[in-house]
Amino acid sequence: MDPALAAQMSEAVAEKMLQYRRDTAGWKICREGNGVSVSWRPSMEFPGNLYRGEGIVYGTLEEVWDCVKPAVGGLRVKWDENVTGFEIIQSITDTLCVSRTSTPSAAMKLISPRDFVDLVLVKRYEDGTISSNATHVEHPLCPPKPGFVRGFNHPCGCFCEPLPGEPTKTNLVTFFHTDLSGYLPQNVVDSFFPRSMTRFYANLQKAVKQFHE
């Protein structure tokens, strides 16, 4: 992928993520519990929903980021039940790459294994926040693979945010914005994301404790 185009695209995605983060209008809460809130609103990108999760994770910002960051050989594959593989297709800079993520079957196998090819940008902000910003791309080195339905992530990612005066806690805001593709009943998709996002936070908390205590 052309580096200049990749840089331009990724900065546009990061800007869109900031808009999602700042925009408080139109969100409807669909799941709450254990300190985690999941809400949604209709996507402007595809005929589906944009989901937003927010919760406090007990761990320093760097510890939490270490568990969620997109990295080959990283911890995410070890604890996230919705990720079975992560590979770099093209490394563009230290903070920008094209990746392939594979996911297992889900929802009692109604959702078959998926894979996603994304342009991913990591950004650090002046207040200490670290964000991962991703969107789907096509890449000649990663055509569709047998055994996987190719899904498409629209602008998505997460913000690991410091909590002033509480260095051992991190506010994690996540955005899931995924077209799972294939022929899936909408009610299956609508019930899958809020449940899986709630589990994501619970499993992440266990991972921070397991890998960083």
UniProtKB/Swiss-Prot annotation:
<dbReference type="InterPro" id="IPR023393">
    <property type="entry name" value="START-like_dom_sf"/>
</dbReference>
<feature type="domain" description="START">
    <location>
        <begin position="1"/>
        <end position="213"/>
    </location>
</feature>
<comment type="function">
    <text>May be involved in the intracellular transport of sterols or other lipids. May bind cholesterol or other sterols.</text>
</comment>
<dbReference type="GO" id="GO:0120020">
    <property type="term" value="F:cholesterol transfer activity"/>
</dbReference>
<dbReference type="GO" id="GO:0015485">
    <property type="term" value="F:cholesterol binding"/>
</dbReference>
<keyword id="KW-0813">Transport</keyword>
<dbReference type="GO" id="GO:0070508">
    <property type="term" value="P:cholesterol import"/>
</dbReference>
<dbReference type="InterPro" id="IPR043556">
    <property type="entry name" value="StARD5/6"/>
</dbReference>
<dbReference type="Pfam" id="PF01852">
    <property type="entry name" value="START"/>
</dbReference>
<keyword id="KW-0446">Lipid-binding</keyword>
<keyword id="KW-0445">Lipid transport</keyword>
<dbReference type="InterPro" id="IPR002913">
    <property type="entry name" value="START_lipid-bd_dom"/>
</dbReference>
<protein>
    <recommendedName>
        <fullName>StAR-related lipid transfer protein 5</fullName>
    </recommendedName>
</protein>
